[in-house]
Curated annotation (Swiss-Prot):
Keywords: Chloroplast, Plastid. It comes from Trieres chinensis (Marine centric diatom). This is Uncharacterized protein ycf90. It is found in: Plastid, Chloroplast. Its main location: plastid. It comes from the Eukaryota. Belongs to the ycf90 family. GO terms for cellular component: chloroplast. Pfam families: YCF90. InterPro entries: Ycf90 (IPR031383).
Length: 380
């Protein structure tokens, strides 16, 4: 059976066109005739093309990668590269140790790399306007993918909300601007409490039913209280709580996972997460400095001075390039279960999570029940 499986591989005809189609690269041998007569392509019956695999195939692949990378990588490309590296590393570690240990090591590394990946998305989103204004074509593809993801999420969420509302309210096909603007926060809760319970123009949710059972003499007062609470007071309270939760969530999750529950969190994740929190605190001041410099350059242009703004633009490009290079440098280190040294930041990180062992092979302890599993390979 194993011999038959190996022989099936040789039954697949692999040529240059097969490899190029697998990587999604256009075939340079495609024959195109003038459109005034006929255009022939992707038709092996009319124009059979089959080129043997050679060094020319490798040259075409390398050239396609170079041409594609001129506008940078998209987020999907970065994700695919990280997953490919993790998969290859999983196979190597599974052969060297075992599948269970390899799975633990790769999962921990991938989680640590995901922290830097989401930070890179946040930086791209915050500085998308500057990337476009400074003409940083190497980051244009990643910037476009971040904006497309954000717009797609907004459109899909709003369309889902409106679709569900129209199912519940068949007589209403339009919603006010305030309802649409608040759809991300309070609109769903408000609809669940009130509008979703409308039947025959009457609200049958428990809160409305309680107010409807009050004496008619109190209706002018109770109705005013009811609409004041549901239309003014409660939306403001909920929106403020949501904004506070969103602002506190990064720090709160870091504190509980890396400090309170640190016995359940591998050292690699705690190290990179703590380093990222410290770096993010410093990074915001660098970005504020860049924003002030950009305003200064814009003011100089209004005065008719153009040589200094050009130099400032070059400096801003260098700063943003260095920012993204460092983020992806840290991402690669996390993906391979490695650490790196940055003055002040590394010392501050290890004051929080403890110093790492200076040995060629270090393990990460994962307590499971009464036993402790040691996984992870790290070098000094």
């Amino acid at each position: 059976m194993d011999l038959l499986t190996k022989l099936l591989v040789f039954l697949i005809h692999i040529d240059q066109e097969t490899i190029l189609n697998f990587f999604g690269i256009s075939d340079p041998n495609t024959i195109v005739i003038n459109s005034d007569y006929q255009t022939i392509f992707e038709n092996s019956e009319l124009i059979p093309i089959s080129t043997n695999v050679s060094l020319e195939t490798l040259r075409i692949i390398v050239q396609a990668i170079i041409d594609y990378s001129k506008t940078g990588l998209s987020l999907v490309d970065i994700e695919n590269i990280c997953l490919l590296i993790t998969f290859i590393r999983f196979i190597i570690l599974a052969v060297k140790y075992n599948i269970k240990t390899s799975f633990y090591i790769c999962s921990i590394s991938l989680f640590a790399a995901a922290l830097w990946y989401f930070h890179a998305k946040e930086v791209l989103l915050n500085w998308s306007g500057s990337i476009k204004g400074l003409g940083m074509k190497e980051l244009s593809r990643a910037r476009s993918s971040v904006i497309d993801d954000k717009n797609a999420y907004r459109l899909s969420y709003r369309s889902l909300i409106v679709t569900e509302f129209r199912k519940q309210l068949p007589g209403k096909f339009s919603f006010t601007d305030s309802e649409i603007r608040s759809s991300n926060d309070f609109f769903s809760l408000k609809f669940a409490l009130t509008k979703a319970a409308v039947r025959d123009e009457y609200r049958i949710d428990p809160i409305s039913m309680v107010f409807s059972r009050l004496p008619k003499s109190l209706t002018p007062v109770t109705d005013k209280i009811y609409y004041t609470i549901f239309d003014n007071l409660l939306p403001r309270i909920v929106n403020q709580c949501i904004r506070t939760f969103k602002a506190m969530w990064p720090v709160t999750s870091w504190v509980y996972i890396t400090r309170v529950w640190k016995q359940y969190c591998p050292y690699l994740i705690r190290w990179h997460w703590t380093f990222l929190q410290t770096y993010d605190w410093i990074e915001q001041y660098l970005f504020k400095l860049a924003f002030r410099i950009a305003i200064y350059a814009w003011s100089l242009q209004r005065e008719g001075i153009y040589d200094r703004p050009a130099v400032i633009a070059v400096g801003l490009r260098c700063m943003l390039y260095m920012e993204f290079l460092f983020v992806f440098y840290a991402l690669i280190h996390a993906l391979f279960s490695q650490y790196f040294y940055v003055p002040f930041l590394t010392e501050n990180t290890e004051l929080h999570v403890g110093p790492r062992l200076k040995i060629a092979f270090i393990v990460v302890a994962i307590p499971i029940g009464k036993s402790i599993i040691h996984v992870g390979s790290l070098t000094d």
